[in-house]
Amino acid sequence: MNTKEIVNKYEFKFNKNLGQNFLVDESVLEDIIKGAEISKEDTVIEIGPGVGTLTKELLERAKEVYSIELDGDLIPILQEELKEYNNFTLIHKDALKIDFNGLMENKDSIKLVANLPYYVTTPIISRLLKEKCDFKSLTIMIQKEVAERIDAEPNCKEYGSLTVLVQYYCNTEIIRKVSPNCFIPRPKVDSIVIKLDRLSEPRVRVKSEKLFFNVVRSSFNMRRKTLWNSLKSLNIDKESMENAFERAGIDPKRRGETLSIEEFGKLSDCIYDIL
């Protein structure tokens, strides 16, 4: 059965508070599966399985699938629809509260697939990256504007701290755009399927990741300010900051949105050296 048929079969009522929009376009489903590149060696962690339409396709291809679902009304539906699969584990929990490192422990070749409610997209991606969870890739359907921020380059309005965070740890690839007409109920925004391939090492080597991300965050807090004014929040004396900018070869009159990840790394290391 397809998604609409399963929804009708169980007379499922969508929960607006959970931001539920179920994918009904099979071509998008196929592109997610193709993009995720799932094999029998892979353990898949799926966030937001809905009524299990994508989950079935994952179960047919993966070694095992762990699906995380918050909505208690979906649990019996998933249990019934997927009862024939012995490689399926259903976790009834909020993905924001999951111990991902614990879940991934002693598992090889972990790939994540997610159709996230838009309000939890950034918190979950940030957690997976900052907590250094051991996964190979994350194939995710998210709001178009967020995907464009993740995949952005310097000198554009989409480029920001989320861009730097994700691209510090991952390569990014936009797989396809998804129209609101591909969902029930129909959302008010366009979506994009994007894949994040985890790098074996961060894109740049820095002396302090904590300082690096503090510099990045401060540089984008007030986008129209120069780096000199933005980085005053670090509470470093004027002479030391002048020295750091000079050693990094970066004009303090530039704005954060003009710096590459490599330049942020160079600047944060020069600040680290003078602290």
From Swiss-Prot:
- List, alphabetically, the GO terms of the cellular component aspect: cytosol
Q: Is the keyword RNA-binding in the record? A: yes
Q: What UniProt keywords are attached to this protein's entry?
A: Cytoplasm, Methyltransferase, RNA-binding, rRNA processing, S-adenosyl-L-methionine, Transferase
Pfam families per the UniProt record, alphabetical: RrnaAD
Q: Where does it localize?
A: Cytoplasm
Q: What does this protein do?
A: Specifically dimethylates two adjacent adenosines (A1518 and A1519) in the loop of a conserved hairpin near the 3'-end of 16S rRNA in the 30S particle. May play a critical role in biogenesis of 30S subunits.
Q: Which family does it belong to?
A: Belongs to the class I-like SAM-binding methyltransferase superfamily. rRNA adenine N(6)-methyltransferase family. RsmA subfamily.
Which NCBIfam families does the UniProt entry name for this protein?
A: ksgA (TIGR00755)
Q: What is this protein called?
A: Ribosomal RNA small subunit methyltransferase A
Q: Which species does the entry assign this protein to?
A: Clostridium botulinum (strain Loch Maree / Type A3)
- Specify the taxonomic lineage: Bacteria, Bacillati, Bacillota, Clostridia, Eubacteriales
